[in-house]
Structures are given as C-alpha cells and as structure tokens.
Amino acid sequence: MLHIKSIPAFNDNYIWLIQNSDRRCAVVDPGDAAPVLEYLAHHELTLDAILITHHHHDHIGGVPELVRQFPGVDVVGPKNEPIPTLTHPVDDGDQLELFGEVFLVLGLSGHTAGHIGYVGDAKLFCGDVLFSAGCGRIMEGTPQQMFDALNKITALPQETEVYCAHEYTAANIAFALAVEPDNQHLQQYRDQVNRLRAQNKSTIPTNLRQEKFINPFLRYTEPSVVKSVSNRTEQTDPLSVFTALRAWKNEF
C-alpha cells in the first residue's frame, strides 16, 4: 500500500510524495526542491522517481536540484512537452511500475498541449486539469481537449482519489455557487472547506464521486447548470455549455 503526503510549495502548490514501506519515495510535480529536500531529510527517505504532469515552471522548477542531490533518479514526464530533464518520456496509454503498483499514463491535453496524469492504486495525480469544484485554465489546448480530458477522468472508478496540484478549492466553490446557488451538496461542501481552511488544513485529496455532485465542469448536462449559462450561449450541447462555463470562470 502506498502512502501519500502533501508538501506545500509557493502560495498554493502541492507537491505530492508517494512513499512505500521501505522509506523509498517518488514526488509529483516538484516546482521547488527546497521543501522536498527538507521533508526527505527529516523523514530519512530516498528519492527514486520524479513524476511530472506538464512543463510549467511551478511544476518542474525543483527537478534539476533534485537530480543533482539524487543522481540516477528516474524523471518521468510527458514526451510531447519541453522538459529537458526527462529520463523516461511517456504518453497516453503507457504504464509504469512504482513500488509494486502499476500506474497508467493518461493523456490530458487542454491546460497544456501535452499534459498527462498518472492513475494507479485508486489514486489520480492530475496536475492542473481537474481541481476540486473546478478545472484548469485552457492555456495551450482547446475547449474540446479539456472537455475530453475531464471525460477521460470521470470514466475512472468513482472511488478514485484525486490529487491535484493546487489549493484552489475555496475560490472554485465561490464560482460553482454562482452557477448553482441552490446546490445543497455545494453548500455543505463550502462549509466543510471553510472549516478546513480556517485550520490551515488541505482540502485535497477529493474523489470523483464527490466531484460529480459539486463540480460545474463535470455537471454541464445538469439542467441547473445549462440554465445558468443560457445567457452566455444559445447552444445547449455539452461542449458549448462547458466552453461557456470555462469562459465565465476566466472572468469571475
């Protein structure tokens, strides 16, 4: 069984640490090496692998220093993105073994052109694609690509835990409630998140079952969501509703 720990970085990033029972570990999207090295030293862990979801600096900035400190560490990441430190470029459908668990690589283009995720042991590391109550900005891809990426994620088992890379939940809930002010699941989740954040606790991981009740970007066929965006698009097909939602969130 793998154990997952969060290492906070910058203002709102999470670097995820995946640990086995033998004090060996991997990290996901280490934008900063310093907090990772501090955690590894404090807990006497050895770094075996670095998993990268996309090329943005707040996800890869710490990789060169970690490679210097741990020569021979595997650096796994998207083959279609400009990341010079990769030792193991991977793409959609590839598999990798990590501490006895098989992880499947998912192509999740949209936020960036070559964004990927990793799913295994009922855990999804999805970078900046799916957030709790939200989704990533479409910075290099198209609405269709992000739409397809989210649908690929929602096809996973509903118990899948979602480890996204940022603590955006409270802000996402504010937007989600603007879309669905009468959503009781959202109202309850807002209260839960407010309690956690008041104690400086993380709201992540979330899970797919919960997100389907609260995340407007997964609820684009719900009548309440379609009605909310009706003044922004005359189309009611799922992609048009999703695209209108993402444009609305950009200016929210």
UniProtKB/Swiss-Prot annotation:
Instruction: Identify the residues that bind Zn(2+) 1.
Output: H54, H56, H111, D128
| Keyword terms of this UniProt record | Hydrolase, Metal-binding, Zinc
State the InterPro entries in the record: Clx_II_MBL (IPR035680), Glyoxalase_II_hydrolase (IPR050110), HAGH_C (IPR032282), Hydroxyacylglutathione_Hdrlase (IPR017782), Metallo-B-lactamas (IPR001279), RibonucZ/Hydroxyglut_hydro (IPR036866)
Secretion signal, residue range per the UniProt entry: none
Give the cofactor binding note.
Binds 2 Zn(2+) ions per subunit.
Molecular function per GO: hydroxyacylglutathione hydrolase activity; metal ion binding
* Keyword hit for DNA-binding: no
Q: Which CDD domains match?
A: hydroxyacylglutathione_hydrolase_MBL-fold (cd07723)
Q: Which residues of this UniProt protein bind Zn(2+) 2?
A: D58, H59, D128, H166
Biological processes per GO annotation: methylglyoxal catabolic process to D-lactate via S-lactoyl-glutathione
Q: Which reaction does it catalyse?
A: an S-(2-hydroxyacyl)glutathione + H2O = a 2-hydroxy carboxylate + glutathione + H(+)
Q: Which cofactor does it need?
A: Zn(2+)
Q: Does the keyword Transmembrane apply?
A: no
Q: Report the EC code(s) recorded for this entry.
A: 3.1.2.6
Q: In which pathway does it act?
A: Secondary metabolite metabolism; methylglyoxal degradation; (R)-lactate from methylglyoxal: step 2/2
| Pfam families for this protein | HAGH_C, Lactamase_B
Q: What does this protein do?
A: Thiolesterase that catalyzes the hydrolysis of S-D-lactoyl-glutathione to form glutathione and D-lactic acid.
Q: Which family does it belong to?
A: Belongs to the metallo-beta-lactamase superfamily. Glyoxalase II family.
Quaternary structure and interacting proteins, as annotated: Monomer.
Specify the protein name: Hydroxyacylglutathione hydrolase
To which species is this protein native?
A: Vibrio atlanticus (strain LGP32)
Gene name for this UniProt entry? gloB
